[in-house]
């Protein structure tokens, strides 16, 4: 039985919210889903919002019950910001992030490399912006929760996938035990160790 952390992570700069797990006993039997997304990080959340923009419903499975701890993604490029604008969260990123154009690398007190990104006055976004990943994830989570086409299931971990001719069958573990889910399409966005 999957038991994700159910106490807020400790942080001096971010207030973690623990979301209630989606439990199979509280929902009707599962029918064939159009799209299932495994992984509720920036890629999975953005994919769900993009699908919803085109009217495609999806189920988004996240093994944890809160957004990530620390930042595996902290710098977002202009192109990333354009995608985030499409899904409705770019304004929050620019409002709270730190934009920059220059970067320096130092070794033993001496600058050994300087990077300068081009920027035109007509560009909608700066070349890069820094924002901790948990803030970006929270903005994306809030957008997903506001969209009726997205079924966000916290505390649901994919443990096995079987490919069939016309669908995928997933074994999903939750804090109360496993259930089976079938999908016409499966998006694996559960990180570098996906498999």
Task: For the regions a language model picked out, list residue spans one by one.
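Core beta-strand elements of the Rossmann-like FAD/NAD(P) dinucleotide-binding domain
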Residues: 31, 176-185
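Conserved SAM/SAH-binding loop
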Residues: 155-159, 174-175
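Conserved structural-core and active-site-/substrate-pathway-adjacent residues in large, well-folded domains
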Residues: 37-39, 48, 58, 84, ...
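Flavin (primarily FAD) binding-site architecture
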Residues: 188-195
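Active-site-adjacent segment of FAD-dependent monooxygenases/related oxidoreductases
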Residues: 72-145, 155, 162
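Extreme N-terminal leader/targeting segments of oxidoreductases
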Residues: 1-35, 53-54
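N-terminal Rossmann-like FAD-binding beta1-loop-alpha1 element of flavoenzymes
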Residues: 30-60, 65
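Short, conserved active-site loop motifs that form the nucleotide-linked donor/cofactor pocket
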Residues: 150-151
